[in-house]
Amino acid sequence: SNYVEAVLPDGNRLAISREKELTKKELDRALYRKLKEITGRSLAWGVLTGVRPTKIAMKKLEEGMDKGAFVQWFQKENLASEEKTILAWEIANREKELLDRLDYENGYSLYVGIPFCPSVCSYCSFSSGALFDWKDSVEAYLDALCKELAYIGKVSVEKKLNTIYIGGGTPTTLTAGQLKRLLDCIDTYFSREHLLEYTVEAGRPDSITPEKLQVIAEHGISRISINPQTMQQKTLDLIGRKHTVSQICDAYHTARSLGFDNINMDLIAGLPGETLADMEDTLSQIKELEPDSLTVHSLAIKRAAKMGRSDEKPSVGPDTKEMVDEARRVAKEMGLLPYYLYRQKNI
């Protein structure tokens, strides 16, 4: 037999596979059940942590498994709730529709990072610095970046460029002239013949100006992201985002007036001091703006973030799950359907 019987500390017996991965999964389930019994708590994703559930669903989808079989298998394998199991399946199907448009054999995506921000948010762990501290290095960085883009364009000339994403940091910390220089450089070295999406993460509204948006529009960029994270002024002040709620709305309306018809907005659930009522108010304001897509993160404190190094490191608030559920409900009201699920960690 490929199984041996093990006796757990509480006296229960468990059949354990001789295969290492199966053994780990069986022990995960046994531990989860015991902790659930002791604490009275159950987790929506069961034993899963630190993974993208849709990656598992995608694998089964590509193997030809149907929805009914997947739901039964996933719940038994991971002790996940039926709601989350179905969510993973539905998102995997939407992901597949999008990914099937890409050329996996000869296609590629280009990410361009701008590691500067107006100020560093207290929760942020990305490799970026405040523009005030690095303003004398921006031109040198762009010089090096354009050289690298020229090289990548040359070595990738036989491949099909599917997507471009300019992120950071905050790309709009560049001046309008610097932004034009960067976008001109990309236009010089890369063909758009096979391009499906071109995104600039416009980011924080305190760095977005009509002139910069005009430069982005003139380069035919199809998608931008304007990221409030919250529409609560008290929270914006607390986390080091030196802008106002009205600046968020102004940046959004300016982008619409210039013809941008694919605008994403980012929110974070569980920011310090925020309640479910705060999240409901934020979502109400976002709903009025009507962005074309919405990205919702739950607060994750990394060691590299200021907040992570603080003596008063905040924990995930009790309302965070309800905040995420409310965001999902409002997004559905807005006609938005989930097409991507981030790695699930504190679940």
Located regions from the model:
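Auxiliary Fe-S-binding modules of radical SAM enzymes
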Residues: 1-65, 72, 301-303, 310-347
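Short, glycine- and charge-enriched coil/turn segments that flank and shape catalytic ligand pockets
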Residues: 10-20, 65-68, 154-159, 194, ...
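N-terminal [4Fe-4S]-dependent radical SAM core
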Residues: 35-42, 62-110
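Residues at alpha-helix termini
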Residues: 37-38, 76, 218, 257, ...
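Short glycine/serine/threonine-enriched helix-capping/active-site loop
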Residues: 112, 296, 341
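Conserved non-cysteine loop/helix-boundary elements of the Radical SAM core domain that shape
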Residues: 128-326
